[in-house]
From Swiss-Prot:
Family: Belongs to the ViaA family.
InterPro entries: Uncharacterised_CoxE, Uncharacterised_ViaA, VWF_A, vWFA_dom_sf
Subcellular location: Cytoplasm
Function: Component of the RavA-ViaA chaperone complex, which may act on the membrane to optimize the function of some of the respiratory chains. ViaA stimulates the ATPase activity of RavA.
Keywords: Chaperone, Cytoplasm
A GO CC term attached to the entry: cytosol
Subunit structure: Homodimer. Interacts with RavA.
Major localization class: cytoplasm
Name of the molecule in the record: Regulatory protein ViaA
Record SMART domains: VWA
A Pfam family recorded for this sequence: VWA_CoxE
Residues annotated as signal peptide: none
Protein's UniProt keywords contain Chloroplast: no
Length: 488
C-alpha cells in the first residue's frame, strides 16, 4: 500500500513545513503560554525536546498509509500523465466516471471540465486541455494529501498537548521543591514522563513542606552535599625542597611505668627481687641474675621528640576541584526510627535528591532493616521511585552490617566508583564485624570514598560511629526539637 511519505515525495509536499507549523501552533496555545511565563526554567527544558518531537512526527508520517481511494486515484493520475493526447481524450469519459465512483473531491470539477470541452463537437488535437486537466487534478490530489496530514498531525497535537499538560502540572508543582537551576529543571522535566496524577505526587509536596519547616535539616543536607572541597595538586615539573618537622617517637625516657621486664637496673627493682638480698641462701642467686640481666624491674617509657627531614613541592599551581560523585544513601527503617525521625530521614533524602539534580549527580537509596530495598531517585522513573520510597513505613529491625556490605558492593560498580555513602540512623545497633570495618577503611584510604553518618539520636553507639569520616548530628528528641524551635 502507498505510504504517505511516498505520496509527499511524488507530489513535492514539504512535510517538515507542516510539522513546523503544528509545533509553532502548539507552543503558542494559551495553556502553555501562561505556564511558560510562570516557570521559565521548565520552558527552557521543554524547548530541548522539540527536535525529538519533530523526529517522532516525521516517523509517524512515514508509517502512515494512504487511504485506498486516494491511492487508486493517484495511480490513475500517474497513468494519465503517461498517455499521449489522443489516448487521453479517448479515456477521459471513463476517468470522470471512475472518479465519481470513488467519490473523489475532484469528480465534480472533472465533470465540469469535460462538459466545457465538449469533445464530441470540438475534438481536441492539442495538449493544452490535457495539461489544464492534469494540473487541476494534481492540485486536488495535493489538497487531499495535505488534509490527511492535518488530520494526522491534529491527532498527534491533541495527544502531545494532553501529555504536556500532565507533565507541566507535575513539573510546575515540584519545581519549587527540586529544581534550583536550569540543569535541575531539565532533569526534573525528563523525570516527569511517567503517568502520574496529582494524588500520586502529593506525598512529595507534603515532605517538601515539612522540609521547609525544618531549616536546620535542610541546612545540614546542604553542608553534607557541598562538603567536598578543592584539593591542591602539584604540577608534574614541580621542584621539591627539604623542611624539618618534629616527630614524636616512643623512647626509654622515664616518664611513666609501662610494664615489667628483665634487666640489671637496681634502681627500678621490684620488691620481690630485693628480698633475696636479705636471705643468705638466695644472695648468690641475686648476684647471678644481676650479672645475667634477669632481675625483674619496672619498665619506664615516654615520648622523645626528634627532628625529621621531609620533602615538599615549592609551588602548587593547580587546585583541582574534587569531583562530586553520586550519593548512596542508607536509611535505617527500624522501629526506633519511626515517627518524627522517619519524617526527618525521608525529608533529608528529598533534600539530597534536590542537590543531586542541581549538580547532575545520581542518588541511590537503600532501606535497611531485616531486608534491603533499593531505589534510584535520579533515574528516568525517579519520581515514581521517590513516591514509593516516601510511602514506606519504618517498622523493621536493624541490620547495619548487611547495609554497609551492600554499599561496599555497590561502590565496586563502575558507575558508583566515586560515590559517597550517607548512613541515616539512630545507630542503636549491634557491633559491626571487624572484617567489615577493615573493608570500609580500605575504601576510605585506597579509593578516597567517604562515609557520612547522619545521627538522628544522641544515644548512638560511639564504637559504631567511629568508622565514619564525618558525623552530622540531628537529634530528633523532644528536647532538641524544642531548643531548635526556640532558636528560630
Amino acid at each position: 500500500m502507498l505510504s504517505l511519505a511516498t505520496l509527499d515525495l511524488l507530489l513535492s509536499i514539504s512535510e517538515s513545513e507542516l510539522i513546523e507549523e503544528m509545533v509553532v501552533g502548539l507552543l503558542a496555545s494559551p495553556q502553555l503560554a501562561i505556564f511558560f511565563e510562570k516557570f521559565p526554567r521548565i520552558k527552557r527544558a521543554l524547548m530541548k525536546d522539540i527536535p525529538g518531537w519533530k523526529q517522532n512526527l516525521q516517523q509517524r508520517i512515514r508509517e502512515a498509509k494512504v487511504p485506498a481511494g486516494l491511492a487508486n486515484e493517484f495511480a490513475l493520475y500517474q497513468q494519465s500523465q503517461l498517455e499521449d493526447s489522443p489516448l487521453f481524450y479517448a479515456h477521459l469519459p471513463q476517468i470522470v466516471v471512475q472518479l465519481q465512483q470513488w467519490h473523489s473531491p475532484f469528480a465534480t470539477q472533472a465533470k465540469t471540465l469535460l462538459h466545457t470541452a465538449d469533445l464530441e463537437r470540438n475534438p481536441q488535437t492539442g495538449d493544452s486541455f490535457q495539461t489544464l486537466f492534469l494540473q487541476r487534478w494534481r492540485v486536488s490530489l495535493t489538497l487531499q494529501t495535505i488534509t490527511i496530514h492535518h488530520q494526522l498531525l491534529e491527532q498527534e497535537r491533541e495527544q502531545l498537548l494532553a501529555e504536556l499538560q500532565q507533565r507541566l502540572a507535575l513539573s510546575g508543582a515540584l519545581e519549587p521543591i527540586l529544581a534550583t537551576n536550569d540543569g535541575a529543571a531539565g532533569r526534573l522535566w525528563d523525570m516527569s514522563q511517567g503517568h502520574l496524577q496529582r494524588g500520586d505526587y502529593q506525598l512529595l509536596l507534603q515532605y517538601g513542606d515539612f522540609l521547609q519547616q525544618q531549616p536546620e535539616l535542610q541546612q545540614l543536607a546542604e553542608q553534607l552535599g557541598r562538603s567536598r572541597s578543592a584539593k591542591a595538586q602539584p604540577t608534574p615539573d614541580a621542584r621539591f625542597e627539604p623542611y624539618t618537622v618534629m616527630v614524636r617517637q616512643p623512647d626509654t625516657v622515664p616518664e611513666e611505668v609501662s610494664g615489667i621486664h628483665q634487666s640489671n637496673d637496681i634502681l627500678r627493682l621490684l620488691p620481690t627481687e630485693l628480698v633475696m638480698l636479705g636471705m643468705s641462701e638466695l644472695e648468690f642467686e641475686f648476684y647471678r641474675r644481676l650479672l645475667e640481666r634477669r632481675l625483674l624491674t619496672y619498665r619506664l617509657q615516654g615520648d622523645n621528640w626528634q627532628e625529621k627531614t621531609l620533602q615538599r613541592p615549592i609551588s602548587l599551581k593547580s587546585h583541582d576541584e574534587q569531583p562530586r560523585g553520586p550519593f548512596i544513601v542508607c536509611v535505617d527503617t527500624s522501629g526506633s526510627m519511626g515517627g518524627f525521625s522517619e519524617q526527618c530521614a525521608k525529608a533529608f533524602c528529598l533534600a539530597l535528591l534536590r542537590i543531586a539534580l542541581e549538580d547532575n549527580r545520581r542518588c541511590y537509596i537503600m532501606l535497611f532493616a531485616t531486608e534491603i530495598i533499593h531505589y534510584e531517585l535520579s533515574s528516568a522513573s525517579g519520581i515514581e521511585q521517590a513516591i514509593r520510597f516516601l510511602s514506606q513505613h519504618f517498622r523493621g529491625g536493624t541490620d547495619l552490617a548487611a547495609c554497609l556490605s551492600s554499599t561496599l558492593s555497590k561502590m565496586e560498580e563502575r558507575d558508583w566508583y566515586d560515590a559517597d555513602a550517607v548512613i541515616i540512623s539512630d545507630f542503636i545497633a549491634q557491633r559491626l564485624p571487624e572484617e567489615l570495618i577493615r573493608k570500609i577503611k580500605i575504601q576510605q584510604q585506597a579509593h578516597q570514598h567517604r562515609f557520612h553518618a547522619v545521627a538522628m539520636s544522641a544515644y548512638g553507639k560511639p564504637g559504631i560511629m567511629r568508622i565514619f569520616d564525618h558525623i552530622w548530628r540531628f537529634d530528633t528528641g523532644l528536647k532538641s526539637r524544642l531548643i531548635r524551635r526556640w532558636k528560630r
